[in-house]
């Protein structure tokens, strides 16, 4: 049967059986309301429009549809309450409902509000104006200003072209949109300038037809999609805090001849080389359990996910986030001089279609929180780095992200890999997905921009955003979070003959820990993989673990190391490694 739920935002048809309980049917209604941007914290139902007979849902959850007296085609009036910050002055504020907590299992997709990153809060306060010097065209004094020397907005196209900036920064793009969306002189209400695209068909359409694939209308089907190069990028630069990080990552390929995959842990900081730019500062690399081959890798994703959940929590205690991933694609050139084959270039591909899909999936799992978006999230700051051969046959790094359209296409399952790595194949329409017309813009042989039909496949370059990468100008003077990258074996490197055990821990740490020299001990402890291994032993208490992290990573390490050295857990650890 179909029950019609009428709410302040319209009529919602929900399919159900008479034997189902209201608790089983309510999530469908909750999903529909969420799609209208409404997340109620209280729902009451009644058969009268004035709400005189409304009853809170908590007392009705166990009752069946038949027991409630609902029949096919009945109209049930929905009264709900939302947080005042989310109503934006709508009529829903005054519905007079009593607050009732809805159980979390009845709110699909509902999550706690996450906070924006500190770098976003910092850049939001800046205007990003690009200063200009006085020129020959200026007719004023030193204290004057004219159109030839006045500061430029951070999104200025001429400045970007002159400085070879292919993609403007995210915050420059945001300010550009906000400037046109919320004009100060208009005096109208605020409109969120950003919106996360959604290319999925709406299976809860309220336009009077059965859901897809039995029915479709212009309201529930996605519009035609036109792909073009994204003009902005969420992250502008990837900075590895130590060249030894990359050297140790490549060492696995040098020793085994097989490829390697890892995740990058670090922080997002302001990047001064681009107006309102952001850089991902990589402090550590973690390699999950994997089986490596010459042309790829194999991973047990369930095992990897469980392990990464723990690593993410420990990294957070160290002040780090998972900022990206890195993988190798290296083949020795056979010259005996360390050169490698150049596989990725403008005439082949930069990221294959499968790698692009993988990058989009990772970005979707790590959304960027933004209060300027209608949905509260917008794209992602997750980066993808590839270690491969360049045109000079040298080992080099290339850094990328995929566009927000790529994220939406992959989320809607509209594209897949193809036998040509540079082309993305467009999937067919099925009962589970609807694929609209997809086009892409390109320049023809006459230099004119034309629209091409993307089916059956299109160049994956339209989904890729390139980033710059590098190292600190002076690594010796740069304050690094981890003083030591080598010395203690990296995690999951048993294939190289290295294992993390008490013997390795004794060799690396025992003499320094027994000496009582806190300066040397601080340098030894400031090792990402050592800290992870010590935590996995579960010898230290939570308080002792916090002292260890503070003593290893803080500049003021004398006092925490003194307290740690006197703790029973640390003494137990020293006794164990001494007898190893």
Swiss-Prot record:
Q: Where is the composition biased (Polar residues)?
A: 86-104
Has UniProt tagged this entry with the keyword Cytoplasm? Answer: yes
Task: Give GO MF terms, alphabetically.
Answer: ubiquitin binding; ubiquitin protein ligase binding
Main site of residence? cytoplasm
**How does the UniProt record describe the way this protein sits in the membrane?**
Peripheral membrane protein
List each copy of the MPN domain by range: 238-378
Where is region (Disordered) located? 86-113
Which Pfam family, an example, fits this chain? NPL4
Instruction: Note the Gene3D superfamilies from the entry.
Output: Phosphatidylinositol 3-kinase Catalytic Subunit, Chain A, domain 1
Which keywords does UniProt give here?
A: Cytoplasm, Endoplasmic reticulum, Membrane, mRNA transport, Nucleus, Protein transport, Translocation, Transport
Q: Which GO terms describe its biological process?
A: mRNA transport; protein transport; ubiquitin-dependent protein catabolic process
Residue ranges annotated as coiled coil are: none
> Is the keyword Cell wall biogenesis/degradation assigned to this protein?
no
GO cellular component annotations, sorted alphabetically?
A: endoplasmic reticulum membrane; nuclear membrane; perinuclear region of cytoplasm
InterPro entries named among the record's database cross-references: MPN, Npl4, NPL4_C, Npl4_Ub-like_dom, NPL4_Zn-bd_put, Ubiquitin-like_domsf
Compartment(s) where it occurs, according to its Swiss-Prot or TrEMBL record:
Cytoplasm, Perinuclear region; Endoplasmic reticulum membrane; Nucleus membrane
Query: Which top-rank group of organisms is this from?
Result: Eukaryota
Q: What family does the database annotate?
A: Belongs to the NPL4 family.
Q: What is the role of this chain?
A: Involved in the import of nuclear-targeted proteins into the nucleus and the export of poly(A) RNA out of the nucleus. Has a role in the endoplasmic reticulum-associated degradation (ERAD) pathway.
Its protein name is Nuclear protein localization protein 4
- Species, as recorded: Candida glabrata (strain ATCC 2001 / BCRC 20586 / JCM 3761 / NBRC 0622 / NRRL Y-65 / CBS 138)
Name the gene. Answer: NPL4
């Amino acid at each position: 049967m179909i029950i019609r739920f009428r709410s302040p935002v319209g009529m919602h048809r929900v399919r159900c059986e008479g034997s189902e309980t209201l608790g089983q049917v309510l999530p469908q209604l909750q999903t529909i309301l969420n799609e209208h941007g409404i997340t109620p914290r209280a729902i009451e139902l009644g058969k009268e429009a004035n709400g005189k007979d409304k009853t809170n849902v908590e007392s009705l959850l166990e009752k069946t549809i038949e027991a409630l007296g609902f029949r096919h085609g009945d109209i049930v009036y929905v009264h709900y309450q939302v947080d005042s910050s989310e109503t934006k002055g709508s009529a829903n504020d005054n519905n007079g409902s009593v607050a009732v907590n809805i159980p979390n299992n009845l709110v699909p997709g509902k999550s706690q509000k996450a906070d924006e990153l500190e770098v976003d809060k910092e850049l939001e306060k800046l205007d990003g104006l690009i200063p200009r010097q006085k020129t020959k065209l200026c007719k004023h004094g030193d204290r004057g200003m004219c159109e030839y020397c006045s500061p430029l907005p951070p999104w200025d196209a001429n400045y970007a072209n002159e400085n070879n900036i292919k993609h403007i920064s995210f915050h420059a793009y945001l300010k550009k949109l906000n400037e046109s969306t919320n004009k100060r002189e208009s005096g109208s209400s605020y409109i969120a300038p950003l919106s996360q695209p959604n290319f999925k068909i709406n299976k809860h359409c309220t336009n009077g037809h059965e859901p897809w694939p039995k029915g479709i209308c212009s309201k529930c089907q996605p519009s035609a999609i036109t792909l073009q190069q994204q003009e902005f990028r969420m992250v502008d630069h990837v900075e590895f805090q130590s060249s030894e990080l990359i050297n140790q990552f490549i060492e696995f390929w040098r020793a085994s001849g097989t490829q390697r995959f890892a995740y990058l842990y670090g922080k997002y900081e302001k990047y001064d080389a681009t107006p309102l730019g952001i850089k991902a500062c990589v402090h550590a690399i973690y390699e999950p359990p994997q089986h490596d081959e010459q042309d790829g890798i194999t991973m047990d994703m369930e095992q990897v996910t469980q392990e990464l959940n723990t690593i993410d929590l420990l990294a957070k205690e160290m002040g780090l986030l998972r900022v990206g991933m890195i993988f190798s694609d290296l083949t020795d050139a056979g010259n005996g001089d360390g050169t490698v084959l150049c596989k990725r270039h403008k005439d082949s591909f930069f990221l294959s279609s499968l790698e692009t899909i993988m990058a989009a999936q990772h970005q979707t799992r790590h959304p960027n929180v933004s209060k300027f978006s209608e949905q509260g999230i917008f794209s992602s700051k997750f980066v993808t780095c590839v270690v491969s051969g360049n045109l000079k046959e040298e080992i080099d790094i290339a850094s990328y992200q995929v566009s927000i359209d790529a994220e939406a296409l992959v989320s809607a399952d509209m594209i897949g890999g193809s036998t040509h790595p540079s082309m993305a194949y467009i999937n067919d329409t099925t009962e589970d997905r609807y694929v609209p017309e997809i086009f892409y813009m390109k320049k023809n042989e006459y230099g004119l921009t034309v629209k091409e039909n993307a089916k059956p496949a299109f160049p994956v370059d339209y989904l890729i955003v390139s980033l710059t990468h590098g190292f600190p100008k002076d690594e010796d003077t740069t304050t690094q979070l981890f003083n030591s990258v080598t010395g203690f074996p990296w995690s999951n490197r048993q294939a190289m003959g290295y294992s993390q055990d008490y013997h390795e821990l004794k060799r690396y740490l025992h003499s320094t820990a027994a000496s009582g020299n806190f300066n040397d001990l601080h340098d030894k402890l400031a090792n990402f993989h050592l800290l992870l291994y010590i935590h996995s032993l579960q010898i230290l208490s939570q308080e002792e673990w916090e002292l260890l992290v503070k003593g290893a990573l803080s500049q003021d390490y004398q006092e925490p190391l003194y307290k740690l050295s006197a703790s029973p857990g640390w003494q137990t650890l020293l006794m164990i490694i001494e007898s190893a």
